[in-house]
Amino acid sequence: MTGEQHYSMVIEWSDDDQVYIVSLPEWGPGARTHGTTYDEAVRNAQDVLELLIAGALEEGKPLPAPRLFARTA
């Protein structure tokens, strides 16, 4: 695979946990992280994504195809 991949992040505020929860949908239901601020949640998700990509490449597994999701405001 060549070129830069752009993966989705779904970021939601959790009133119960008082944190932002981030899901990485292309990577399955277990690909989640969180942060106490929006910026921290995004940074944590970027770290998780880097680990997922590195792990898949190391194991010789194909990377999931990026998907397009509707944007909401």
Language-model region placement:
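Short aromatic-glycine-(Arg/Gly/Cys) micro-motifs in beta-strand/loop hairpins
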Residues: E12-G28
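Short acidic, gly/pro-rich beta-turn/loop elements at beta-sheet edges
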Residues: V19-I21, R32, R43
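A short, exposed loop/beta-hairpin motif centered on an aromatic-Gly-Thr core
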Residues: P29-E40
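Short glycine- and Lys/Arg-enriched binding-loop motifs that mark or flank ligand-binding interfaces
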Residues: E26, A31, A56
